């Protein structure tokens, strides 16, 4: 089916204290695994391509077009989202390629500049019917240091959403990007306070470092969109290593990447249950 915008899924998830799953795509096997899991469970899944993935491939279009083809061949409702972009030219390219959601991350800028830049991006995207996510506060780990960043203030977040018109907000509540161990301790009280203060869905970045039970609790407290990348890369890599250990003579990447893709599919299906995904 065609790509969908996240608006309906975000609204349903927020209204019923359920999650919307968002998983990062680095290579085609990721997208195929996510689509397979979405079809098997009937859930909506957000397929995310990050600015870092674009740097790895050297361009956005080849991977984006491949993901669009996967989505159009799928029977599941899939969202194509640009993740953590601070490059406005990249955001515009994503809009031209048919992305149905974009994240513009100006959180490193002073507050007033963050507001102004984000509002401009939101206006441009909304004119095309595309959803916009932004970030306020500082989620740890962007620089490789797994320390929690500056927590998001509910009052400032309310002001920010009103001033920018964004559709969802990534908030800093104790998680950290790129964690390989699931030891993050989330501030559930702050999540609840942000949920009560804001009219837009909350987004949790750095969810790979959060234990299952805490992810479930975070969704119940008011977190909506749950971003997971590193944890699924871990699943893929572990499966590839295990396959090659058992089949040391194999050199065909379809063999070992197929094992990795299957492992990611299985883990995604499990995670969809953990967050009670819509």
What name fits each language-model region?
Residues 211-278:
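C-terminal alpha-helical cap/extension of soluble enzyme domains
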Residues 1-4:
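Basic/polar N-terminal segments that are highly enriched at the extreme N-terminus
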Residues 24-25, 80-86, 200-212:
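Glycine-rich beta-to-alpha transition loops that act as phosphate-gripper elements at the mouths
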Residues 6-16, 28-53, 60-75, 85-197, ...:
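Alpha/beta enzyme core
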Residues 174, 205-208, 228:
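Glycine-rich beta-strand-to-loop/alpha-helix junction loops that act as flexible
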Residues 23, 52-56, 79-80, 260:
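Short secondary-structure transition/capping motifs
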Residues 22, 81, 133-135, 203, ...:
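Generic enzyme active-site microenvironment
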